[in-house]
Amino acid sequence: MENLRRAVHPNKDNSRRVEHILKLWVIEAKDLPAKKKYLCELCLDDVLYARTTGKLKTDNVFWGEHFEFHNLPPLRTVTVHLYRETDKKKKKERNSYLGLVSLPAASVAGRQFVEKWYPVVTPNPKGGKGPGPMIRIKARYQTITILPMEMYKEFAEHITNHYLGLCAALEPILSAKTKEEMASALVHILQSTGKVKDFLTDLMMSEVDRCGDNEHLIFRENTLATKAIEEYLKLVGQKYLQDALGEFIKALYESDENCEVDPSKCSAADLPEHQGNLKMCCELAFCKIINSYCVFPRELKEVFASWRQECSSRGRPDISERLISASLFLRFLCPAIMSPSLFNLLQEYPDDRTARTLTLIAKVTQNLANFAKFGSKEEYMSFMNQFLEHEWTNMQRFLLEISNPETLSNTAGFEGYIDLGRELSSLHSLLWEAVSQLDQSIVSKLGPLPRILRDVHTALSTPGSGQLPGTNDLASTPGSGSSSVSAGLQKMVIENDLSGLIDFTRLPSPTPENKDLFFVTRSSGVQPSPARSSSYSEANEPDLQMANGSKSLSMVDLQDARTLDGEAGSPVGPEALPADGQVPATQLVAGWPARAAPVSLAGLATVRRAVPTPTTPGTSEGAPGRPQLLAPLSFQNPVYQMAAGLPLSPRGLGDSGSEGHSSLSSHSNSEELAAAAKLGSFSTAAEELARRPGELARRQMSLTEKGGQPTVPRQNSAGPQRRIDQPPPPPPPPPPAPRGRTPPTMLSTLQYPRPSSGTLASASPDWAGPGTRLRQQSSSSKGDSPELKPRALHKQGPSPVSPNALDRTAAWLLTMNAQLLEDEGLGPDPPHRDRLRSKEELSQAEKDLAVLQDKLRISTKKLEEYETLFKCQEETTQKLVLEYQARLEEGEERLRRQQEDKDVQMKGIISRLMSVEEELKKDHAEMQAAVDSKQKIIDAQEKRIASLDAANARLMSALTQLKERYSMRARNGVSPTNPTKLQITENGEFRNSSNC
């Protein structure tokens, strides 16, 4: 998304801009009918931006959802529309719209959040029936003015180097909310500048020193250190959080498991089941966490490893484990488990049961991270103590793994985007307000910070002051006769193919690999004030050995173009030239050595700013006490120290050169220098010619019409633009080298400097074929100081590159003008003319032969150079292929290891589930055995009861028989002499023992 924005606004970082940010919470609604689901839609200036989830009405409708929008257009109103979710089964229920809440953007503008109950404006208000529905909304709308990055350079450098003293001075006076905002800005800025690891380590060690022996207080107070690590965890750990807990949290949202284990909130019969559910959920959560080490962010590993190393060096290695566990679990993982919507794991706020389950899981996880058991305060959780003790060793192993510096290469780095300008602007506004509240004694300890803040505040208060000169229209040069020519050149350059350029405006967010992209300061040896340039060396590009041994190309110069042009003492352009439009060549010696001919206005206008030559001999040596100038983009740029003709700097590009003429080149070959030296005999002719500008101009125009350079064909700019993080295309093989031209292969492998304004205009060279000539732009230094002249001449000595078209034209024009003066009687005396011509013809023939021999040697040398260059390109291409092959293999290996880690994780989960299943089976078997044994006892008792019942029945029948027999004898009057004796046998039967 950021790349799309930069495509629309490529000059964003180098121009003054305004950012609009809205943060809004839709919290809850009241006075709505019950047993319905309600949702809200968020519209900004009548454009739908977001929608809440549907929530069921209980006491109130609670959403608790937050939304954050950046890069907004200027807002007038924020509207929240309230809807009732329609039941799809009831077709008659069509009208689900209930009303709206309209907030003027100005009412919530500022740094503080505004939280209020807002009445819902309904389409059909019902008067006299009590208050209508209301929605509680918390919102903040900010308009942030952001200056160009150049304006924040000193501020950012000061923050990067003096953050510790700043935090110590501001800590006592800041509120908790301000600390949070300041810590967020500092973390984002230092992440961009590559100093965040040192920043967090220094803050943590100061926090350890402050707490002393009270280790339990670390990360439990609202300090800048706590807020900083919180923000850093959110910044680099968002993807890790999603990978580690995203699926688990989503599964909990969808499940209906009840994990309430508080006896006061659930029945005793359900308690064992709920305890089992909670234990299972905690096991799964911790299993997810300890197996997430393979996707743990590399930056966090580096920070934790730095903490462990620093604690060991201070003689307190035991506290490093507490630091790591407290920061990761207390400030990141456990809050994310409790409130997934705040950490963007899910949008919806959980219902009551899910929220309670998440809270209990977070309690167990936090106790596990603290290596503590549940006590009397939460006695109902004591059943989890066995689980905690069992997992302590795994927790220690996990903490050791995520702080092990030896496994840093196995994990990915931060891939997000940071708007550095916005963060610097936010930090400036916070510091501007905070520093004004400090005592003067404390302010004096902050060094240059108050002055830097005042400078930035002045730039913010002055509209238009933040616009860099390089961001203006490159073709807008008033009062210059070459304005149309410059405009044509700019148009031609914009339409050229830009696929070979490094696009500075589309660089990815800084990482440890490319963190030097931002604020890499290099001071120039010839500038009175430090001139810094942002540089970047791409690892994927072929290494080109520059003339000065450097392999890094400076892409943007942060110096003011108009300042450089104005420091020479006199402006360079048509308004600074004499009235006849000519400057004697003797006055141009600083810019073009070994030239002794007048230069017309038409030729000089093409290099008006590219070669700002002094117009008087006095100024050519540099005024005393006046700073000497540098070449465009400063002379540190190795692209200006190469032997071949190189493109003009972006600063001089917009108003130099034309479509029909080549720009001047300071690289002259040996024969041109020799020819120019031999023309000294025509000095009187040159002086006479200087007094006749009209005829010379006419002849030069006729010469241009006869042998002028054809216009270079324009190329469509719709070709693909390669980003810096993409591999470069393989270099094409060099075509046959035409006579007197620089082949494109000498320039095709160069990385041309990107314009500091971020526009698409570039100085990419074109090779249009036999009918065109290569544009060679000037690379001479602007107003070189006398000390730099010998070195510059040494670097720009004889070169195998042939002179460009304008150099050859100037030499030939000088010869033609001398011949013209001879014909008109201005040369030597006529009697000596014939003798002179014969000698000149002979010397000319010898000279032509020598020139041809030199050209042959030069051509042979060029051919050898091209062969060498082609071999170097082949080797470079082969190296790139091997490098990408190695990267591919490394990526495959990393994916394989990650897959293995995932497999191990799944196997661990499966083994845990199998062990749980085995335990359940074992418990079931034991219970079944107990039931079987009890059943056997019951069966035996039932048999015994049945036998007793049978014996009892027989006894009763025997008694009945005896009673009947006794009664019969009594009725017959017979008294028994010998009463019958009954005896019970062993089998329970009665036996009569009488003799009868």
Curated annotation (Swiss-Prot):
Its biological purpose: Functions as a scaffold protein implicated in the regulation of a large spectrum of both general and specialized signaling pathways. Involved in several processes such as innate immune response, inflammation and cell growth inhibition, apoptosis, cell survival, angiogenesis, cell migration and maturation. Also plays a role in cell cycle checkpoint control; reduces G1 phase cyclin levels resulting in G0/G1 cell cycle arrest. Mediates signal transduction by receptor-mediated inflammatory signals, such as the tumor necrosis factor (TNF), interferon (IFN) or lipopolysaccharide (LPS).
Organism expressing this protein natively: Rattus norvegicus
Membrane-topology annotation of the record: Peripheral membrane protein
Positions in coiled-coil regions: 832-966
Biased composition range(s): Polar residues: 460-475, 522-538, 746-762, 774-783, 974-996
Compositional bias per record (Pro residues), positions renumbered to this chain: 726-738
Gene name in the database record: Dab2ip
Name by which UniProt lists this protein: Disabled homolog 2-interacting protein
SUPFAM superfamilies in UniProt: C2 domain (Calcium/lipid-binding domain, CaLB), GTPase activation domain, GAP
Modified residues (Phosphoserine): S535, S554, S785, S802
Domain Ras-GAP, first and last residues per copy: 194-402
